[in-house]
Curated annotation (Swiss-Prot):
The lineage of its organism: Bacteria, Pseudomonadati, Pseudomonadota, Alphaproteobacteria, Hyphomicrobiales. It comes from the Bacteria. Disulfide bonds: none annotated. InterPro entries: ATP_synth_F1_dsu/esu, ATP_synth_F1_dsu/esu_N, ATPsynth_dsu/esu_N. It is found in: Cell inner membrane. F-type ATPases have 2 components, CF(1) - the catalytic core - and CF(0) - the membrane proton channel. CF(1) has five subunits: alpha(3), beta(3), gamma(1), delta(1), epsilon(1). CF(0) has three main subunits: a, b and c. GO terms for molecular function: ATP binding; proton-transporting ATP synthase activity, rotational mechanism. One of its GO terms (cellular component) is proton-transporting ATP synthase complex. It is a peripheral membrane protein. This is ATP synthase epsilon chain. It comes from Rhodopseudomonas palustris (strain HaA2).
Length: 135
């Protein structure tokens, strides 16, 4: 399988940089996979789990929004936050969800809609992480 270069960058660090076979991205308009030779595209990333496949092994990384750019040079993801699933503190993540829920009553209109959507994404990540941890 052909490989391509992938960089995953967050404000804190370069979370990943190297040659990969495939990257599956949680896009705002739907999840999508990137392989070598993918058409150029820029896409918004929603909070979710990004999966990197390289050399037959998979690495899963929680991203909490950002931008993905596919070009002839490869794939670059600029993530708001990028944390390996093994490094996620489940208690802190649950507390973040609780705080988000408590803040909902103070929001209206579009702000409320965006907050509910973000909360739903966080709950989905929490479910995926807890399901993965059980296997």
């Amino acid at each position: 399988m052909a490989t391509f270069h992938f960089d995953l960058v967050s404000p804190e660090m370069v979370a990943f940089s190297g040659e990969v076979d495939q990257v599956d991205i949680p896009g705002a308009e739907g999840d999508f996979g990137v392989l070598a030779g993918h058409a150029p595209v820029v896409a918004v990333i929603r909070p979710g789990i990004l999966t990197v496949t390289a050399g037959g092994a998979q690495q899963k990384i929680v991203v909490l929004g950002g931008i993905a750019e596919v070009s002839e040079k490869g794939l670059t993801v600029l993530a708001d936050v990028a944390t390996a699933t093994a490094d996620v503190d489940m208690q802190d993540f649950a507390e973040t969800i609780t705080t988000m829920e408590q803040q909902l009553p103070g929001k209206v209109g579009d702000e409320l809609d965006r907050s509910i959507e973000r909360l739903d994404h966080y709950k989905s990540i929490q479910h995926q992480l807890s399901t993965t941890a059980m296997h």
